[in-house]
């Protein structure tokens, strides 16, 4: 199918992108084939009039968990027990897989055309990836890690990560993941905000350096990159010293950390969204304890300072929003761009570039997607207003196109309560 997208204003996704009017985007099946001037012969094309809207690359979310919808719970939940129950029989497995697929679809309806999953239930993420690629499922392109590798008492152990007691068990899980044809490997090196037992100890080191090195060495031998959950300065150093390729979340850096990033050639995937509710919400709203709020502020400040320091020192920065955590819904990745602009001080232009072409490059798919250029996948979105002027334009989409599949007037079901709580932090 040949399509011509007319009467739109192009934003190509490059770092210096500027609005380009009077252009027509031509696609054939799942590929962009040309960008031409108005007035060319469009015989043989289905013409889609964009009515003056802004066409930019589809967003790319590099830190996704498809096992949750972001709805905050009234009380703490035993996620490991819930996953054991889900996997206990075929019926509950089937229901859970359908939910995961529905959450992937919500990402797409929210304008995200590529996701990178970094911890999920069993092999659900690679199955979802393959179903989407085969056209059996409406979802973004998926780069999947399946279950992460954690340790007993470690972050997400037993839910979206497997608890490895020793190096042999960690390597056995890596072999299992490789058999599932994952795209990357995920380690849980430190704890998180809610894992801390005391004030001032978020991001406590959980995984021994020897295990990190053993998994990284074997993963690299097999051709995989390794992403690692790290939320403390100590954890970041252990990760980088032992071969990790991307730091997920991040923490405040010193000169030694900067040197390690550069020597390793690693990048940091900034995630401002998950700590924000714990750090900034009133505890009467979040339900967080004084300890959790205190630790949330440490992590929030660490993530923001990590991104700022990285940008100032030429360390690559990616964006993800840790969707699936409380208050982070599958349709609102656009908020992460707003937070990146607000708290890290980047321009709207740079935020959009980071969430499109830069993310694609850092995820290893920059030759396939991330910018509007011939030969790349037909992955783009259309907004009524200019996101370079206000990133909130990305909230309401006129059109989503993923691998050539057109979704007009996408309208994801929204959690109005969560949206209302988060909206003040966009100002």
Protein language model features and the residues they cover:
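Histidine/acidic-residue-rich, glycine-tolerant segments that coordinate divalent metal ions
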Residues: 115-238, 246
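Active-site core of metal-dependent hydrolases
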Residues: 191-304, 318-325, 345-346, 360-363
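Active-site microenvironment of metallo-dependent hydrolases
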Residues: 1-23, 28-29, 36-38, 86-88, ...
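His/Asp/Glu-enriched, well-ordered alpha-helical/loop segment
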Residues: 221, 225, 291, 301-386
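N-terminal small/glycine-rich loop or linker at the start of catalytic domains
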Residues: 63-85, 143-159, 212-213, 281-283
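Divalent metal-coordination and catalytic microenvironments
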Residues: 8, 25, 30, 52, ...
């Amino acid at each position: 199918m040949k399509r011509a997208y007319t009467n739109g204003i192009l934003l190509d996704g490059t770092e210096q992108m500027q609005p380009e009017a009077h252009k027509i985007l031509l696609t054939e099946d799942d590929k962009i084939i040309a960008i031409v001037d108005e007035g060319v012969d469009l015989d043989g094309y289905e013409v889609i009039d964009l009515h003056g809207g802004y066409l930019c690359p589809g967003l790319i979310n590099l830190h996704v968990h498809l096992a949750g919808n972001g709805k905050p719970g009234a009380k703490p939940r035993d996620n490991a027990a819930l996953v054991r129950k889900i996997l206990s029989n075929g019926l509950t497995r089937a229901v859970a897989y359908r939910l995961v697929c529905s959450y992937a679809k919500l990402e797409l309806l929210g304008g995200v055309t590529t996701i990178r999953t970094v911890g999920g239930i069993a092999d659900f993420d690679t199955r979802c990836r393959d179903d989407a690629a085969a056209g059996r499922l409406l979802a973004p392109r998926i780069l999947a890690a399946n279950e992460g590798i954690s340790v007993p008492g470690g972050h997400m152990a037993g839910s979206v990560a497997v608890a490895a007691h020793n190096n042999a068990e960690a390597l056995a899980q890596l072999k299992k993941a490789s058999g599932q044809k994952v795209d990357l490997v995920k380690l849980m090196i430190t704890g998180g905000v809610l894992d801390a037992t005391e004030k001032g100890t978020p991001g406590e080191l959980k995984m021994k350096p020897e295990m990190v090195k053993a998994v990284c060495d074997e993963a690299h031998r097999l051709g995989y990159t390794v992403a690692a959950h790290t939320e403390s300065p100590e954890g970041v150093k252990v990760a980088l010293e032992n071969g990790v390729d991307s730091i997920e979340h991040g923490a405040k850096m010193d000169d030694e950390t900067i040197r390690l990033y550069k020597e390793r050639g690693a990048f940091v995937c900034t995630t401002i969204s998950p700590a924000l509710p714990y750090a900034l919400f009133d505890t009467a709203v979040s339900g967080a304890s004084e300890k959790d709020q205190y630790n949330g502020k440490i992590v929030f400040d660490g993530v923001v300072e990590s991104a700022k320091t990285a940008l100032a020192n030429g360390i690559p920065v990616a964006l993800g929003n840790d969707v699936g955590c409380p208050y982070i819904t599958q349709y609102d990745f656009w908020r992460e761009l707003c937070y990146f602009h607000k708290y890290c001080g980047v321009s709207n232009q740079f935020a959009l570039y980071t969430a499109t072409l830069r993310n694609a490059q850092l995820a290893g798919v920059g030759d396939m997607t991330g910018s509007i250029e011939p030969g790349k996948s037909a992955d783009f979105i259309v907004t009524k207003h200019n996101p370079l002027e206000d990133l909130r334009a990305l909230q309401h989409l006129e059109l989503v196109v993923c691998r050539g599949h057109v979704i007009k007037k996408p309208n994801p079901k929204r959690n109005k309560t969560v949206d209302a709580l988060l909206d003040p932090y966009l100002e």
